[in-house]
Amino acid sequence: MNTSISRRQFLKASSLAAAGACAAGLLTGCGGSSSGSASGAASSGSGSSYTILYNSQPATLNYLTTGTDLEMVVGANCVDTLVEYDNKGVMREGLATSWDWDVDTLTWTFHLREENWVDCNGEVVAPVTAQDFVDALKYVLTPDYAASNVGLVTAYIAGADDYYNYHLYLNNANTGVVDDDGTTYTVDGSGVVTVTAPDSDPATYAPVDFDAVGVTAVDDHTLTYTLTYDFPGFLSLLCYLPYEPAYGPLLEETGDQFATSAETTYSCGAFYLAAYESLETWVMKKNPENYDADNVFIDTISRIYNAEASVNGPEMIKRGEIDEATIGSDILDSWLSDDTTKDMVSMDRPNTNYTYFYMFNFMPFSHEFSNWSVEGMDAEYEPENWAKAINNTNFRKSFLYGINNSVTLAVKAPEGYDNYKLNTITPPSFCANADGVDYLKCGDLANITEFFDEAKAKEYRDAAIPELTAAGVTFPIKVQMPYNPSSTDWDKQCQVFKQQLEGVLNDGFDFIDIIITAGPSDSFLSSVRRNGKFAFLQCNWGADYSDPQTETDPFYQAEGARGSRYAFLRTGVEDGFITGDTADAVMNYMKAIEEAVKITDDINARYDAFANAEASLINNALVVPMGMSIPAYIATRLNYWEGQYASTGFSNKRLKGIHVLDHYISMSEYEANRDAR
């Protein structure tokens, strides 16, 4: 008897399951009752190894400096944090067994448990102490190491911003840096740095020692952080990369070579990094020295490099050679119609802390930043023409109202795609104010509704055409839109996006020419987004902590800041790339964020202020919202519902608490596991 099911039947059930999971996960991420391990979890199968392919090479394994999805795997699994979350999103003890808050001194005190560092052989090196957190934070605040998440420290830890800026300016002085605008840096014999900007009085910066930074090892098992203000999201921030510990003597010995290999990485988490060979293999093993080793059920995690993982992975699943693979939309139908594979397909656990949006490149030319150079768009994509077009608000609004996100989301979620659609950057149920009002119902965000409107899009297009023509823009405007070939179905999303948006905006006039380009599979962010080699790009952002300020990180830049942000909006204004009413909109957003950050004693007012700023960012089409992360269709032997969960940070990447089963999970089992957690 043929018991195959149709794709529509499967997807309808799975989309409802995923949508329910999203809602449940988002809500529990903001509160809920504590729970032990998920009930109904199957026991381990014949082995406790977990093998998966990967096809995108991480640029680094240094968890103190990275911020990308793939590269934080080691930090998430091999290094424990002060606090962690259970599988329902409830915070619990981690390396700290207790903590206290002193509002008068703005100081958190953490009391640490006994724990050890182990090397790549699993041998004990030294105990974990409070000083390891201090040394790690000093490493993050060292400009030479260019930590991508340094802003998560300088914004909240007392003295950190002054320390970092002084040493950044000192480095500039010692290396003879001259900024694009002519700003110079000099240092005298006493270490005082003078910064001289054109048309400004020189500013002097006295030496700042690390002792001035608000992190202290009171003794081996007592750690304190002194904050710049009573920041409500600080505890949730601790379950993220820049607040992880690192063994101080190893940092001192290895410097910028820290965590570039298994030999230069020490672990104190559920697993230790046993082997790492670039473009070959990546092995983590269970750490028997970990305090919670009894709740680690996987002995060996092996990641094997395969450039064609999306093709070879499913075939290796059929042969039982690996434990997980993504089932792309191009083969999903055949898998669901085949009795031998239909019960091997389920879904990943929804990653509710990630949202997706489109960014415009406001700086399409080569540009020098404080710690790297941006090449900009290639000449064939006409960056000069794009630079003129992107400064036109009506042009950008034609995109905002012309994009039908349902079409693009349907590539990965053929049924239930509207469950993932967003008209904001922040997802629903991320946090609520003191009265329990969802953040998306606060301030001006409460007025944002569906943007897609073909008639409005054409109105904005028609208004833009004479303005752009007067500015010297030629049509059609080339829109370079890259994708990462290692990301399943991203290429297909780009194709339907091009067809849909061109169908709207090119109706009656040759307005735009969306040119889809394949970026490199390895180091895509460094090669494309951070290198300015795009005009319009799908980006994502994962919340780092439970406060709306985290959703500003891709967009906000402090005055004069030259650090890494997705769009370099303020830099674009300061350096003359962004002009006119677009520049006004950018600066109004920056000022609104600066005012919102100052509100620390009234949560309702704080959330309203951030909501107003986010609404202005969107309504001025400085960014175009897309949707929430859609869980992939996968074949897996892991019950991810047993694992840690949080709506912020990297908890969802941790494999502690998860069993390897003796079979691939079906969709019905996936739903049962979800309901039993």
Please name every model-derived segment.
Residues R92, K285, W386-L505, N612, ...:
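Append "and occasionally in soluble cytosolic enzymes with long acidic Gly/Pro-rich linkers
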Residues L53-V103, Y266:
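N-terminal lobe/hinge region of extracytoplasmic solute-binding protein
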